């Protein structure tokens, strides 16, 4: 039985979290652009369970929703930009790489961190310059994402980059430095 689009949109906009979760779980095969955009907008929901459900259904959706995800990378919402880059990576969707690269200088450190992680996961060798620059970001999580992305790409660090990571005095960097 097909659920009418209006009912889906009403339930997604509902303040009742149980109704939202119930509706979201039924949308893994949906390809309606309007519904997918509405689902993506829920990355700004206060409830982490809703955001997690959104992430899951978009990753599991086997339809070609690349264009919608790529368009969402220009959203005003840092959550939408960040999570859509990760979803493209989880879907192994290389179509979004050039669009994701543009977000390496995003105003949000959370978005930059996710973007660098996505580029590493996608093995985006054409983003090496941007990933290397991430080592010198002001945010420690962005540095970690950049370092991890470089390790996934089998890239070596310059002496200057090694010094920058060693300065962080963080066990995560020690592990990553051993890989690089």
Predicted regions and their residues:
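HEAT/HEAT-like alpha-solenoid repeats
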Residues: 6-13, 37-44, 67-74, 98-105, ...
